[in-house]
Regions:
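Conserved acid/base catalytic micro-environments in cytosolic active-site loops
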Residues: 1-308
Length: 308
């Protein structure tokens, strides 16, 4: 917090996989750190560690450059900026939670439908923790099933889910293999596992695997988005938030090809304009929105989807 206030600079947090370590790392990210990397265990090779460290350092450097550029820009009058926002969470508490760069606007409404097959999938990476604390708490409690991939190490994803759950109307928790998706529930992919959605007789069902990383990432957004395109087709709304690299771009194109809707965070609010940019280069983005308007964009998309 002191660094962020007096000496702003890119910060990479290296933390242990303990509960206390994960909680501290999450607090650091909320205070301004760009990335978190778990301390390696004895089973990781030097080559794998070097590649992972280099990837994270590049991401943090890119985030630092981007934040400086955003700070230097004059304020855009079309983007609502706030330091906090009040949300009535699932417990009925009118609690205030911090959003360091952007806040939410008016209430988001999603229309409930019979025989609902809609599916919301969200992907994010560098800067994504802050972005998710803006989007997820804005979703109403009747939101269709939601699955999130945030590039984050194992054990940290559970802490992220708990923190989002405390401030949200939907129930947020870490996904478990075989879990059936239901309305009003948002599942966070566990760190270290790819997550896919299957269309089964029970409904949409989660499958967790530990197949090789994609784009140096596990979980990978591409795995989630591609599975959603196959499982839900035109009933899918895919959202790609801030992040370095190209993960999620091909998956978003697959969603669009299947008839689904796609939303990407606009460059004006991205900490790292990598993943949304890559999707744009593939012409896979139907709508670009600054972060404060993403939740409303999601509602508009879901409300327009036809139930069959």
């Amino acid at each position: 917090k002191i660094l962020a206030k007096h000496h702003p600079m890119p910060v990479l947090v290296v933390s242990s996989l303990t509960e206390d370590g994960s909680e501290t790392a999450m607090q650091c990210m909320e205070a301004g750190a760009s990335e978190v990397l778990s301390k390696p265990d004895g089973s990781m090779s030097v080559g794998a560690l070097s590649a992972q460290l280099a990837h994270h350092v590049k991401a943090v450097y890119a985030a630092g450059r981007r934040e400086k550029a955003l700070t230097a820009q004059p304020h855009n009058t079309n983007v609502h900026v706030a330091t906090s926002s009040k949300t009535l969470n699932k417990h009925g508490d009118d609690k205030q939670h911090a959003v360091s760069t952007v806040g939410r606007t008016s209430e988001v409404r999603i229309t409930s439908k019979l025989n609902d097959k809609r599916l919301l999938v969200i992907g994010s990476s560098t800067g994504g923790v802050k972005a998710l604390t803006c989007v997820i708490p804005s979703l109403p409690k009747n939101c269709p099933p939601t699955v999130v991939v945030q590039h984050i190490p194992s054990h940290f994803s559970k802490v992220l889910a708990q923190r989002l759950n405390d401030m949200s109307q939907v129930n947020v928790r870490e996904a478990e293999d075989g879990e059936v998706l239901t309305e009003g529930v948002c599942l966070i992919a566990p760190g270290g596992f790819h997550i896919a959605v299957l269309n089964t007789p029970k409904g949409y069902q989660v499958r967790l695997t530990q197949t090789p990383p994609i784009h140096f990432c596990r979980p990978a957004v591409d795995v989630l988005f591609t599975s959603a395109a196959k499982a839900a087709g035109s009933q899918t709304t895919a959202v790609l938030l801030t992040g370095m690299g190209s993960d999620g771009a091909q998956g978003m194109l697959n969603v669009m090809t299947a008839g689904g809707d796609t939303i990407a965070e606009d460059e004006s609010t991205c900490i790292v304009y990598g993943m949304p940019r890559a999707a744009g280069l593939l012409n896979a983005v139907k709508t670009k929105l600054p972060l404060p308007h993403i939740a409303h964009g999601i509602a508009k998309s879901l409300n327009q989807l036809e139930v069959y």
